[in-house]
Structures are given as C-alpha cells and as structure tokens.
C-alpha cells in the first residue's frame, strides 16, 4: 500500500499550523541556548538530559508533519464495496458518494473521511482512521516537550546554581528574562490546551466514540458493547505491540476489521 500524501489548501489552517511550528522552533533553539548548554558546560546537568530534549522535540516534529500530510482516510470516488458489507454503507447527502457508516463529510476539506474524529486547524487536516494515531502521538509529545521545557525554565531560576560564565554580547543573554517569560507564557498556554485535548481524545478512544459522535449525541441512541481499552487502542494504532504506539516513524497497518466498524452511527 503506497504512501498517500494529503494536503489541504486552507489559509486559516496554514496560519494555525505556522503558529505551532513557531512555538516548536522557539523552544527548540532558545531553551538549549539559554538553559541546557550553559548548565551542562558548568557541570550542573548531565548531557543525557540534552539528548532527551532533542529526542522528544524530533518525535514531536515528525508526528506533526506526518499528521498534517497523511491521508486521514479519504474515500475514493468509486469505492469497491464488498458484497457482504453493502448493508453497512450509506449515501452521503453532500457529495453523493457511498461511504462506510461512521464516516463523516468534512465541509472544510470537501470530502468524506472514514471514522472522522474532527477537523483540526492546528495540523490543517482532518483526524480520521488513518492518521488518528499520529495525532495522538502529537498530543503526547507536545505535552511531554512542554513539561520538559517548563521544568528546565523553572530550575534555571529557582534550583540550579547561578551561571558563572555569561556572554553579554549575545542577544539571547542580554534579553534572557524577556525570552524566558515569553517561553513560559507559551508553554503554560500550550500545556493547558493540549492537556484538555489529549484527555478528551483518550476518553474517546476508550469509549470507542469520535468527537463528532459526542457532539451529535448519537451515542445515547446506540447500544454499543464496551471493548477492552487494549483493543480500542490497538485498532487506532494498527498494532497490538504497545511499544510501537509511541513510534511516529513507522508505517501503520490497516485495521483488521471491516470497513464499517460494526457499531456505527
């Protein structure tokens, strides 16, 4: 199965994603420059903490890029419907194409997406069956990176010994306080937002319910048998190997269940 690149032409989405990239670049370059490397050179922290910071940052960036360009599960114009599954398909009243039940038509993208959770402007893409796992990784690594940066910002002023060597000729050193205050503001704002989003995503997977289904209150009308959380997460990530749930570099295998997901909207 070839790699399907999905690119949404949406200026609003570009602006939102550009803001996320700016915050990532701000932390990626300035936190090590102001905090990590100076304290490492004076023996206050081990080098492994710097490696961990860059590792988390790279995992976060890979998850962001892949979540934004991966096809979320767009349906082809002439899908081949297995004969035994025709009863689980329906006609979309917006694009007049057949789709599996639990699919949704995205008005911003202009097409139907399999098991669509929501359209996220922060990645300028829909979150659907084929990229939901990457969106979860993005939430996880963004929260981890934000906590890591905030922790070292706090330690820089209130825990670590004062730096003995400071090159005041450098712009980042002369304006360190303003830079760190902005980093703390962005970090706290990001942490609050991403924590709420990540929590709702986890609850949705555990209960096998998409965000669109929650908003439409359709779940109250459906007698949906509860699945074990391991099964629901395995369906999203495409593997039962839990260690692979944290790796954004791999290829996700298609779900080994029918297109329609037996419990549907």
UniProtKB/Swiss-Prot annotation:
Its EC number is 2.3.1.225. It catalyses: L-cysteinyl-[protein] + hexadecanoyl-CoA = S-hexadecanoyl-L-cysteinyl-[protein] + CoA. Its main location: Golgi. It is an enzyme of class 2 (transferase). Keywords: Acyltransferase, Cell membrane, Golgi apparatus, Lipoprotein, Membrane, Palmitate, Transferase, Transmembrane, Transmembrane helix. It is a multi-pass membrane protein. Residues 38-44, 155-185 are extracellular. Residues 1-16, 66-133, 207-265 are cytoplasmic. GO terms for cellular component: endoplasmic reticulum; Golgi apparatus; Golgi membrane; plasma membrane. GO terms for molecular function: protein-cysteine S-palmitoyltransferase activity. It comes from the Eukaryota. GO terms for biological process: adrenergic receptor signaling pathway; peptidyl-L-cysteine S-palmitoylation; protein targeting to membrane; regulation of establishment of endothelial barrier; regulation of leukocyte adhesion to arterial endothelial cell; regulation of vascular associated smooth muscle contraction. The chain crosses the membrane at residues 17-37, 45-65, 134-154, 186-206. Palmitoyltransferase that catalyzes the addition of palmitate onto various protein substrates. Palmitoylates sex steroid hormone receptors, including ESR1, PGR and AR, thereby regulating their targeting to the plasma membrane. This affects rapid intracellular signaling by sex hormones via ERK and AKT kinases and the generation of cAMP, but does not affect that mediated by their nuclear receptor. Palmitoylates FYN, regulates its localization in hair follicles and plays a key role in epidermal homeostasis and hair follicle differentiation. The DHHC domain is required for palmitoyltransferase activity. This is Palmitoyltransferase ZDHHC21.
């Amino acid at each position: 199965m070839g790699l399907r690149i999905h690119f949404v032409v949406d200026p609003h989405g570009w602006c939102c994603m550009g803001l996320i990239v700016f915050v990532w670049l701000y932390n990626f370059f300035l936190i090590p420059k102001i905090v990590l490397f100076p304290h490492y050179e004076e023996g206050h922290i081990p080098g492994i903490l710097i490696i961990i910071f860059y590792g988390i940052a790279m995992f976060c960036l890979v998850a962001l890029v892949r979540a934004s360009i991966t096809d979320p599960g767009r349906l082809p114009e002439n899908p081949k419907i297995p004969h035994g599954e025709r009863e689980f398909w329906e006609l979309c009243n917006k694009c007049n194409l057949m789709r599996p039940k639990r699919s949704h038509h995205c008005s911003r993208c202009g097409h139907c997406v399999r098991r669509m959770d929501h359209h996220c402007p922060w990645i300028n893409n829909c979150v659907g069956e084929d990229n939901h796992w990457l969106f979860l990784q993005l939430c996880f690594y963004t929260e981890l990176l934000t906590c890591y940066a905030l922790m070292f910002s706090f330690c820089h002023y209130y825990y670590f010994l004062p730096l003995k060597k400071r090159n005041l000729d450098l712009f980042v050193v002369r304006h360190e306080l303003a830079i760190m205050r902005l980093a703390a503001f962005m970090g706290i704002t990001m942490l609050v937002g991403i924590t709420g989003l990540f929590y709702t995503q986890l609850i949705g997977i555990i209960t096998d319910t998409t965000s669109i289904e929650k908003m439409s209150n359709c779940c109250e009308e459906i007698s949906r048998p509860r699945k074990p959380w391991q099964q629901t997460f395995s369906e999203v990530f495409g593997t039962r190997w839990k260690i692979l749930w944290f790796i954004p570099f791999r290829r996700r295998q298609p779900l080994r269940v029918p297109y329609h997901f037996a419990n549907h909207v």
